[in-house]
Regions:
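Bacterial Sec-dependent N-terminal signal peptides
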Residues: 1-21
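Active-site mouth of glycoside hydrolases
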Residues: 22-235, 246, 250-251
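Aromatic- and carboxylate-lined catalytic core of secreted/periplasmic carbohydrate-active enzymes
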Residues: 44, 264-268, 275-278, 291-426, ...
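Short hydrophobic alpha-helix segments
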Residues: 49, 426-428
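Short, solvent-exposed loop/turn segments at secondary-structure junctions
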Residues: 53-54, 87, 138, 177, ...
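Short beta-strand segments
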Residues: 171-173, 202-205, 225, 269-272, ...
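Catalytic-core region of carbohydrate-active enzymes that cleave or remodel glycosidic bonds
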Residues: 218-321
């Protein structure tokens, strides 16, 4: 895409997003009363749907920032996770450093590194998007680029600069274990929290770990994240110390339970699952690449396991690959091409689905599935008091106990996870029934079986898309 088109896109952003209602019009983000979800101050639910533009502060110019964030808005994302700095100093696309040669924050000049970050945050706000601010990437802390006193100085700077922006979510860590110089993160987190009373905070851990392993008692941490990572089943890669059982690498649903084994319970989500179009196993493309169906599977498995939301990622977008940059992780396309890949544009159906039903009563409940399998054959079930959702990755038969929710009769639909299309299956008695999404030989289509107490009107028989709800609770789907 050329510069003129980017400039036009940037202008259109201002025209189309300035007057729209923003999520924070509902108040600040906070943890729900049951400690398992995120919500606004006025009680409305917040379903986290994140994207991973990690290198946006360094690799995108202003017009590209506006174009990218508008595409995120249109695709339903409400959180953009970035590295604030990926070096000391870090340099942006204009060649401007974040720090001077002595390692001091550099805020002078006509358009500083931090002015560009301001622009990113403000443009995200215009699009109704929170910015997940990984304050300093973990490798820098591990490498000794920040000590306790520097963390306090940096935290004071960040908190004072951004405490009044409405769309900030703080991240400690950055792909690093929590026992690597934890005193630096404690200093950084506590400094920010002592100044900024407006925003929630979490920690981004190393792959196959949950932040709860190190930070379950940390007062500064409001919710947990885990990184299920980019490996396939039975891809241990010779690791001697392995935090998960063998041959469970893709079972990201299990991290919800392992996180909640730590007390107190806090909301949790997968902040880095396998990315669309990244090599299976990350470093070697001989096994192929993760595709849209895989990123959908990770999203539904995690959320139906109890997560308060989900983060999606794309190999090309996370590094903003284009001509002139060396491609990391065998990247095959540019970031602008990736914005039109299927997985990027299909995550919104999960968000719309979860916001179509009573939000805070939802629990994971595998007891509704009477013939469950393992790995790809595993059906993931979640329910409220009067609705039941079952994600089926392989379109296999499902023996389901409809008695687990209220109602003498149940209305049932099938939702295509790739399109959000709803198919009315009928009304059924309150008993154990076997459902098959498709006729024999019709092929594979991952999706969700939806069963609702027939006395409820969360969905309509005539509704053909999950993102056009009819009736049901007064739920704002714009966040």
């Amino acid at each position: 895409m050329n510069k003129k088109l980017f400039s036009l896109a940037a202008a259109l952003v201002l025209c189309t997003t300035m007057t729209a209602q923003k999520p924070w019009d509902n108040g600040k983000l906070k943890v729900s009363e049951n400690q398992r979800f995120l919500q606004f101050e006025n009680g409305k639910p917040f379903f986290w749907l994140g994207e991973t533009p990690w290198l946006m502060p360094e690799r995108l110019n202003r017009d590209e920032v506006a174009f990218y964030l508008k595409r995120c808005h249109d695709a339903g994302f409400n959180v953009a996770q970035i590295q604030v700095i990926n070096g000391v100093p870090a340099y942006n696309i204009y060649g401007v450093p974040s720090h001077d040669k002595q390692g001091r924050l550099l805020t002078s000049g006509a358009y500083s590194y931090w002015d560009h970050l301001d622009y990113i945050i403000d443009t995200a706000a215009q699009n109704g998007i929170y910015v997940g601010m990984v304050c300093i990437w973990g490798g820098l802390v591990k490498g000794g680029k920040m000590n306790i006193e520097q963390a306090k100085t940096y935290g004071t700077f960040l908190a004072n600069r951004y405490k009044n922006r409405p769309n900030i979510i703080w991240f400690m860590g950055g792909d690093v274990p929590g026992d690597v110089k934890p005193e630096v993160y404690e200093a950084l987190a506590n400094t920010i929290k002592s100044i900024d009373k407006n925003h929630i905070m979490t920690y981004h851990p190393r792959g196959r770990y949950t932040s709860a392993k190190w930070w379950s008692k940390a007062k500064w941490l409001d919710f947990h994240t885990f990184q299920s990572g980019h490996r396939k089943y039975n891809q241990r890669m010779g690791n001697k110390d392995y935090p998960i059982p063998d041959n469970t690498e893709e079972d990201n649903w299990m991290y919800v339970d392992s996180t909640w084994a730590y007390k107190p319970i806090k909301p949790v989500l997968d902040a880095e699952p396998s990315y669309e179009e990244i090599p299976i196993g990350l470093h070697d493309n001989k096994l192929g690449y993760w595709k849209a169906c895989d990123v959908r599977r990770y999203a539904y498995w995690s959320v139906f396991g109890g997560s308060c939301g989900h983060t999606y990622g794309h190999n090309a977008i996370m590094q903003f690959y284009r001509e002139g940059y060396g491609p990391a992780y065998h990247c095959k396309k540019t970031w602008t091409e990736a914005l039109y890949d299927p997985g990027f544009n299909q995550m919104k159906y999960l968000k719309h689905l979860m916001l179509s039903f009573p939000f805070f009563e939802r629990v994971a409940d595998q007891s509704v599935v009477l013939d469950n399998g393992k790995q790809y054959e595993r059906l993931a079930a979640t329910r409220g008091n009067d609705y039941l959702l079952i994600y089926n990755y392989t379109s296999r038969d499902m023996k389901i106990d409809l008695r687990k929710i209220s109602g003498d009769k149940k209305k049932v639909w099938w939702m295509n996870a790739g399109t959000g299309e709803l198919t009315w299956l009928g009304e059924y008695d309150n008993k154990v029934l076997t459902f098959r999404p498709h006729k024999e030989g019709a092929g594979i289509e991952d999706g969700v079986l939806i069963a609702i107490d027939s006395s409820k009107s969360y969905l309509s028989k005539d509704q053909h898309q999950i993102d056009t709800p009819v009736g049901g609770p007064a739920i704002d789907l714009t966040e």
